[in-house]
Amino acid sequence: MRAPKTILVVAIFLLGSSFQDPQIRVEVEAVNLLVTVTGDKGRFVTKLVQQDFQSYEDGRLQEVTNFSQPTDLPLQIGLLIDTSSSVRLKLEFEKRAASDFLYSVMRDKDRALLVEFDTGVSLIHDFTRRPGSIVQSIKNLRAGGGTALIDAIYLVSRDKMFGGTDRKTVVILSDGRDLNSRHTLQEGIEMAHRAGVIVYAIGTTRFGTNLDDKGERTLEELTESTGGRAFFPYSTERLADAFDLINEELRTQYSLTFVPSNTKRDGKFREIKLKLPEHKNFNIRHRRGYFAPSE
């Protein structure tokens, strides 16, 4: 999502030397949505046209002004890896799967960054178009400390994902436990909405016998509210399958734009609902809404 042209957003990193005082100007004329449609047995549907979609904001029909079929718009990928003590035994499997994912998903115009989070949040590698460079950084990750999952989402969305027309995606690899964040779950979701970020998560809660329902709920809420999806493989061997599904989904998304009929600058959350009147058996997934600009 982009914000109105007249809005100037200044974001300053608060994470020390890893984050360097950027000033970000965000200009937005319309609401941009990335949309995933699935049909029978969860298969991706890729042949729909603009006339198939109806867009509603707070229950009011909106005119779709721009549309493209499964898009090759450049990707901005934020890879967030949990390196807390609770994932110590799983980390090596996670590192290999994450490395393979970057090699498979990134194309020439795509960019990715790497963040690790434990007790704090650290930018390990800034945006690059070279997956091999990030993979080398992934190899050096070590486990230890608490967990600041929500802070990682909040700070990456705020300080690295605002502005531009690229598709913005955060992929989390974590058990979903959060012990050290200063920001709440809702604050993390709100910042992702404001930055137009879709969140995907691969939860490691089902590895072994110790399930963490709270961790799973956190990951599900983060992903569902932003139009993404959470995966919970039962073994480290299935990590690659989850990454493959994320890769496939990122390459089968529709891009849709509408100009809101409600022009109030009240800063309120606007609920978005897309419908496929002639294809009611299809499932459609997108972010739940956006925040209007404020004076």
Q: What residue spans do the PLM features occupy?
A:
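Scaffold/interface architecture of coatomer-like assemblies
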Residues: 19-295
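Bacterial Sec-dependent signal peptides at the C-terminal "C-region" and cleavage site
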Residues: 3-7, 11-25
